[in-house]
Amino acid sequence: MPATRLDGKKIAAEIRSEVAADVETFVSGGNPPPQLAAVLVGEDPASQVYVRNKERACAKAGIASRLDRMPAATTQAELLAKVAELNADPAVSGILVQLPLPSKANGGTGIDERAVLDAIDPIKDVDAFSPVNVGLLMQGRPRFLPCTPHGIVQLLHRTGIETSGKHVVVVGRSDIVGKPMAMMLAQKDSTCGPAVANATVTIAHSRTSNLAEICRQADILIAAVGRPEMITAEMIQPGAVVIDVGINRVGDKLVGDVAFDEAEAVASAITPVPGGVGPLTIAMLLHNTLMAAKMQAASN
């Protein structure tokens, strides 16, 4: 029996609808609409698509959006000055700098991404990348949760999949997905309650020598490594839940980090690519932007 396909599009639509209703209530209370400011450096086609998708999602949720375009030749000092400008603008609720920044090979100036992300005011850091917000997450008292891991927690919760007492294997150790995902699931509680926390978590990565063996131990396998169809059926325990975070272009189609067709025959539930985790990332970005606006309104 093939696995249940976990419909990220449907759940993301539910979350966006909830955010839109909350925005309406927030604005009707005399507050200005939340505003998300995106900074796009260079002309990377994929980044431009992502930014357009975010703008459209903001508009549907009643969130104002602002896009600051900067040339690929922008210097680090110029980009830091732009971030400082947005930090100081009271109309801006949330700030995101679209990654990746242009490499020198693509006309960039070698900007230190970490320095730029560190410069964003933590109360406007809706991607939750700043050291302050990462530290709060580590302590179990997060201000904002990283969008993709939080979207996965919402997906698990809203489809009735519990992680408490389960062995979760996260393949990938990025600061954006792998590390925060592991930390969130290992906590005693979550935004969705303790049933979507309290996991025993293993982080695997490209240097893990016995990767297939470790993956086969997972009750829930989360693939976030950025390698097309790296996770094959023989790496999946029969009946496991498989969450595929990867988005990779192979020829004229998008594929995940999981070999979907063969994995679907082994797993009990699986996210497709596209239409799985991706839509949830933007939905949680809207959620974080509204949260930021509420916190800033309360502090004024």
From Swiss-Prot:
The residues that hold NADP(+) are G172, R173, S174, S206, I247
Question: What domain of life does the native source organism fall in?
Answer: Bacteria
GO BP annotation list = L-histidine biosynthetic process; methionine biosynthetic process; purine nucleotide biosynthetic process; tetrahydrofolate interconversion
Q: EC?
A: 1.5.1.5, 3.5.4.9
Q: Which SUPFAM superfamilies match?
A: Aminoacid dehydrogenase-like, N-terminal domain (SSF53223), NAD(P)-binding Rossmann-fold domains (SSF51735)
Described function: Catalyzes the oxidation of 5,10-methylenetetrahydrofolate to 5,10-methenyltetrahydrofolate and then the hydrolysis of 5,10-methenyltetrahydrofolate to 10-formyltetrahydrofolate.
Q: What is this protein called?
A: Bifunctional protein FolD
The UniProt gene name for this protein comes to: folD
